[in-house]
């Protein structure tokens, strides 16, 4: 998994590239947590346009970052989902708590 991050005002924008599955979930989780620790923001946008595959472990990574941001009073936004990933999100009900653009 490749991660590119940039701070845009009060928001951290992170683009993920690769597969977000059980093989990459721990590494991705650790990298995102380090970013959220080092860059004190309340709001995070995850650009998933470069994610070619996601399974339930990837969904868990996103839900965990939602929890961290919620405890800070912040928001998580996702963007750039492929049709397959959008379907996973709709079926899981994640759009009830995570914003999408």
Regions found by a protein language model. Give the residues of each.
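Absolute protein N-terminus
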Residues: 1-2, 101
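STAS-typified acidic loop motif
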Residues: 4-30
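Conserved catalytic submotifs in the C-terminal HATPase_c
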Residues: 8-9, 49, 101
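Amphipathic alpha-helical interaction surfaces in cytosolic regulatory modules
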Residues: 22-98
């Amino acid at each position: 998994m490749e991660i590119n991050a940039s701070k845009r005002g009060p928001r951290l924008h992170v683009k993920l590239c690769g597969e977000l599955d059980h093989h990459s979930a721990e590494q991705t989780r650790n990298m995102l947590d380090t970013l959220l620790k080092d860059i004190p923001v309340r709001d995070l946008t995850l650009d998933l346009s470069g994610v070619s595959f996601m399974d339930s472990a990837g969904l868990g990574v996103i839900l965990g970052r939602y929890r961290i941001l919620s405890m800070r009073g912040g928001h998580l936004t996702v963007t750039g989902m492929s049709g397959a990933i959008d379907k996973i999100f709709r079926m899981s009900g994640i759009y009830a708590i995570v914003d999408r653009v």
